[in-house]
Amino acid sequence: ADIADNKTRLAEGIIDLAKRGAELIVLQELHNSLYFCQVEDVENFNLAEPIPGPSTEFYGKLAKDLGVVIVTSLFERRAPGLYHNTAVVIEKDGTIAGKYRKMHIPDDPAYYEKFYFTPGDLGFNPIQTSVGKLGVLVCWDQWYPEAARLMALQGADILIYPTAIGYATYDTEEEQQRQREAWTTVMRGHAVANGLPVVAVNRVGFEPDPSGQTEGIQFWGSSFVAGPQGELHY
């Protein structure tokens, strides 16, 4: 995928949301590129970048120009041989408010994230922003209630999950429904258990397996906002 084109399209979406009054904008997991973790390929490490780096500068300028807080999800090159799946929160003035490095790393067929990412070392600490204290987690973290609880205990005002999850092409309709409902239910449960709103933002659409070993992933979208009683607002 053309990363420059992707970032341009993301910027267009961010600008549109800001015009419609959004103050907090959350992007999906690893949004700059295709979900490269479908395969184990050393060439994909070329997608990684430092933080701060080109992407934080790009989204920082958008945040400052539009007066919005942006939650990004980046492939961080921290040091030679050390890489993370990192959410970076950009404040309204364009500065980095904080970051969270994904702690729970999957290693399932078509989700070979352990090949790329070292588990985070920043703990579960909410990020203070002008729109509140954001408990930012990433995708697979959503299956673990402890992550949500630790963020809540540290004073988070809202739980946020940039995500990349989808169906295998061979899943039956019944299995697809079970998976999607489990995904929604577990995060609505985090909202109820902790008395906090939850925002989940997922990829959407089909992405082929570049290696041809599998039939690709159909990312199911279904992004939502739930209130503190698990009620769906969006």
At which residue positions do the language-model features occur?
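CN hydrolase (nitrilase-like) catalytic-core segments centered on the catalytic cysteine
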Residues: 48-71, 133, 139-234
